[in-house]
C-alpha cells in the first residue's frame, strides 16, 4: 500500500495537466512509476484505503488468458469491465469491423492467444511460455504482448497494460509487466491485482516458485473529475495491513485455467478496508 499511496501523492503534488483527446478530459500526469509486488511472501497488493473489488480484476485477466473477445464472456466470468468499451465507445461503434453488441474486437487476450502471422496462421504466445517454463527453459524471450499496432483498428481499445515478461532464475519465476497508461484511481486498483495473480498462477501451473513481480508504468494519471476524491478523501485515510491471496491448489495446468476455473477458486484472507469511493470512469 505504501508505494501505491506514494504514487498517488506524487501525482497530486508533482503532476502536470495534460489534455486527453479520447475522453475530452484533462489528466494530472507524471511519467514513469515502478511498483514491486512480493508474490513469494503472498503480500497481496489489494488497496485498503477504499474497498477494492478484487474478483472482477482476476475475472478480467482470466478472460485474457482464455482469449475472450466478447464482453458477454467477461460478464459470465464475473466482471462488467468491458461493457462500456465494447458498447459505448463512439469510435468503436462507428468502426466497420465491429461485429455487434458486446464485440471487443482483436484486443488483449486475442493477441496473446492468436496473434496473426502474414500467412494467416496464428501464434499462441501464452502456450509457448507455459511450455518453456514447465521444462525449466527461459530463452530470455518469454514475452506475452497484447500490443499489435497492425490491428489497432480491429479492436475497441489499445491495451494499457500491454506486455508481460517472465524470467526464470533457478526454480524461481519472476514477472515484469509494462503499462503504457494508467488511470491510477481506477485502473491501478485492477492492474496490480492482475500482475500479482498472473505471476502466482503461472508459477503454480509450471511447477515453479513465485518470486517478485515488477510493474512498470509510463503515463500515470488522475482524471480531473477524480482529483478531489483522491486528494481530499482517499489520501486522508490510513492503510490497513495487506491481505493474502489463496488459489485453489487443484489448478495445475493452462487447460484448467481455460476450462473449469471460476472465481470460487480464489479467496482473499485478512482483508480490511475503508468505505468504497465511487470514482468516475472515462470511456
Curated annotation (Swiss-Prot):
InterPro entries, per database record: Thymidate_synth/dCMP_Mease, Thymidate_synth/dCMP_Mease_dom, Thymidate_synth/dCMP_Mease_sf, Thymidylate_synthase, Thymidylate_synthase_AS
CDD domains referenced in this protein's UniProt entry, alphabetically: TS_Pyrimidine_HMase
Residues that, per the record, bind dUMP: 22, 180-183, 191, 221-223
Keywords: Cytoplasm, Methyltransferase, Nucleotide biosynthesis, Transferase
Lineage: superkingdom: Bacteria
Localization in the cell: Cytoplasm
Keyword Methyltransferase assigned: yes
Positions bound to (6R)-5,10-methylene-5,6,7,8-tetrahydrofolate: 183, 282
GO cellular component: cytosol
Reaction catalyzed: dUMP + (6R)-5,10-methylene-5,6,7,8-tetrahydrofolate = 7,8-dihydrofolate + dTMP
Active site, per annotation: 160
EC number(s) recorded for this UniProt protein: 2.1.1.45
GO BP term, example: dTMP biosynthetic process
Protein's pathway: Pyrimidine metabolism; dTTP biosynthesis
GO molecular function list: thymidylate synthase activity
Subunit structure: Homodimer.
Similarity remark: Belongs to the thymidylate synthase family. Bacterial-type ThyA subfamily.
Function: Catalyzes the reductive methylation of 2'-deoxyuridine-5'-monophosphate (dUMP) to 2'-deoxythymidine-5'-monophosphate (dTMP) while utilizing 5,10-methylenetetrahydrofolate (mTHF) as the methyl donor and reductant in the reaction, yielding dihydrofolate (DHF) as a by-product. This enzymatic reaction provides an intracellular de novo source of dTMP, an essential precursor for DNA biosynthesis.
Name by which UniProt lists this protein: Thymidylate synthase
Organism: Haemophilus influenzae (strain PittGG)
Organism phylogeny: Bacteria, Pseudomonadati, Pseudomonadota, Gammaproteobacteria, Pasteurellales
Gene name of the record: thyA
Amino acid at each position: 500500500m505504501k508505494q501505491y499511496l506514494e504514487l498517488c501523492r506524487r501525482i497530486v503534488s508533482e503532476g502536470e495537466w495534460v489534455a486527453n483527446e479520447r475522453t475530452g478530459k484533462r489528466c494530472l500526469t507524471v511519467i514513469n512509476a515502478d511498483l514491486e509486488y512480493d508474490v513469494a511472501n503472498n503480500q497481496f497488493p489489494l488497496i485498503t484505503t477504499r474497498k477494492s473489488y478484487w474478483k472482477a480484476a482476476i475475472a478480467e485477466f482470466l478472460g485474457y488468458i482464455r482469449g475472450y473477445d466478447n464482453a458477454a464472456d467477461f460478464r459470465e466470468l464475473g466482471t462488467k469491465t468491458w461493457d462500456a468499451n465494447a458498447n459505448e465507445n463512439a469510435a468503436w461503434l462507428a468502426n466497420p469491423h465491429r461485429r455487434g453488441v458486446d464485440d471487443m474486437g482483436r484486443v488483449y487476450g486475442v493477441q496473446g492467444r492468436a496473434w496473426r502471422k502474414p500467412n494467416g496462421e496464428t501464434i499462441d504466445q501464452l502456450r509457448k511460455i507455459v511450455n518453456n517454463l514447465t521444462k525449466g527453459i527461459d530463452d530470455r524471450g518469454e514475452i506475452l504482448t497484447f500490443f499489435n499496432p497492425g490491428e489497432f483498428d480491429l479492436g475497441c481499445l489499445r491495451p494499457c497494460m500491454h506486455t508481460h515478461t517472465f524470467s526464470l532464475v533457478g526454480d524461481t519465476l519472476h514477472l515484469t509487466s509494462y503499462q503504457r497508461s494508467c488511470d491510477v484511481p481506477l485502473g491501478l486498483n485492477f492492474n496490480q491485482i492482475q500482475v500479482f495473480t498472473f505471476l502466482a498462477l503461472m508459477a503454480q501451473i509450471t511447477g515453479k516458485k513465485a518470486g517478485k513481480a515488477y510493474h512498470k508504468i509510463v503515463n500515470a494519471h488522475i482524471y480531473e473529475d477524480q482529483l478531489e476524491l483522491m486528494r481530499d478523501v482517499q489520501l486522508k485515510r490510513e492503510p490497513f495491513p495487506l491481505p493474502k491471496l489463496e488459489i485453489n491448489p487443484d489448478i495445475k495446468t493452462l487447460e484448467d485455467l481455460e476450462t473449469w476455473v471460476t472465481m470460487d477458486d480464489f479467496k482473499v484472507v485478512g482483508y480490511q478496508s475503508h468505505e468504497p469511493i465511487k470514482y468516475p470512469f472515462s470511456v
